[in-house]
């Protein structure tokens, strides 16, 4: 028999000092004779024309739960037409449990980025971009777990089209063997792994009736190599209808084994009226033999105030979990107290 676990999410935000805000979040989930609750406070302050700082503090509560259950986050960002720079730190305690949602990794993260975007005197090119970013994850003893470094060269044309070249380097430290693929089963050994790759992306102007993005990546991957191709688009046959297809392909060749993956998706957006919007998203992932469907209804009952009804269902189509599924029904209401 399927289990029903009701949950509630509440969000309160107040605008202050013009473009800044302070807020709070509470989540509660019941089930299996227990509960999980999370309280959080956050703020985003625009302290100068181009400078923003933000912070968040959260804690989870469960019966008989011990240990550290905190999340701490702080960030600062400078953004103007020529220079963009930012820095962020995140600390997630080992025993923090969000209850609603998930945490990918309970570690400490530090990251920073800087970008220069000069505007040349050209009728063809609107702006160039030269940027770099570095993200670093470590454990409580400051041992490296993950490092991601990227250098980007980009060109923005006067037509609205874009081209980007990314040079990537990544380090992963595995504390135990890792199954990178289940079908076929491919296991990676514990230890330090480092690889580099190059990604090229072409993006057309999104103001056109038909818009598309094409990207390809080639390079090392863990202990071997990987080739990837992704294509996505957006077509607007009329003002009330838009179609957003997407497809991604990965060809992975490792000494431990080789495999390919396919990810296919289609999002359909339809405006019944100016105040009633609908969307349906369908996706299939070959790597997990997993199909997913999301149906969303959005009613705008007042300017910036909305009611959302979202139904999600995922289902395994093959393998050991064939036939198993998970579904959820979500009601979300946004209401501005001060207008």
List where the protein language model places each region:
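Extended, well-ordered alpha-helical scaffold/bundle regions in very large, multi-domain proteins
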Residues: 33-36, 44-46, 52-62
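A conserved hydrophobic secondary-structure block that centers on an alpha-helix together
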Residues: 1-34, 42
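Exposed, low-structure sequence patches enriched in small/polar residues
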Residues: 56-339
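Short glycine-rich loop/turn motifs
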Residues: 7-9, 21, 40, 197-199, ...
């Amino acid at each position: 028999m399927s289990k029903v676990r009701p949950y509630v999410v509440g969000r309160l935000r107040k605008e202050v000092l013009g473009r800044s805000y302070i807020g709070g979040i509470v989540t509660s989930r019941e089930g299996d004779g227990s509960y999980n609750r999370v309280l959080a406070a956050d703020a985003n302050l625009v302290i100068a024309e181009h400078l923003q700082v933000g912070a968040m503090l959260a804690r989870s509560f469960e019966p008989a739960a011990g240990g550290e259950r905190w999340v701490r986050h702080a960030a600062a960002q400078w953004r103007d037409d020529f220079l963009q720079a930012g820095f962020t730190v995140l600390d997630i305690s080992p025993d923090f449990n969000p209850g609603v949602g998930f945490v990918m990794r309970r570690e400490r993260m530090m990251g920073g980025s800087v970008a220069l975007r000069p505007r040349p005197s050209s009728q063809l090119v609107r702006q160039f971009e030269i940027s770099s970013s570095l993200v670093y994850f470590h454990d409580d003893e400051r041992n490296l777990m993950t490092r991601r470094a990227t250098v980007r060269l980009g060109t923005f044309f006067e037509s609205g089209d874009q081209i980007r070249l990314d040079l990537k380097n990544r380090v992963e430290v595995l504390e135990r063997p890792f199954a990178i693929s289940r079908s076929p089963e491919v296991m990676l050994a514990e230890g330090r792994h480092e690889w580099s790759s190059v990604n090229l992306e072409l993006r057309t102007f999104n103001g056109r009736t038909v818009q598309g993005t094409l990207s390809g990546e080639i390079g090392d991957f863990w202990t071997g190599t990987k080739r990837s191709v992704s294509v996505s688009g957006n077509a607007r046959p009329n003002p009330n209808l838009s179609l957003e297809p997407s497809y991604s392909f990965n060809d992975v060749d490792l000494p431990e084994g080789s495999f390919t993956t396919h990810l296919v998706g289609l999002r359909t957006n339809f405006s019944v009226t100016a105040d009633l919007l609908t969307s349906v998203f369908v996706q299939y992932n070959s790597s997990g033999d997993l199909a997913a469907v999301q149906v969303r209804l959005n009613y705008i009952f007042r300017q910036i105030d909305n009611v959302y009804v979202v139904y999600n269902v995922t289902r395994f189509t093959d393998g050991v979990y064939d036939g198993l599924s998970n579904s959820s029904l979500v009601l979300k209401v946004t209401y501005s107290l001060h207008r």
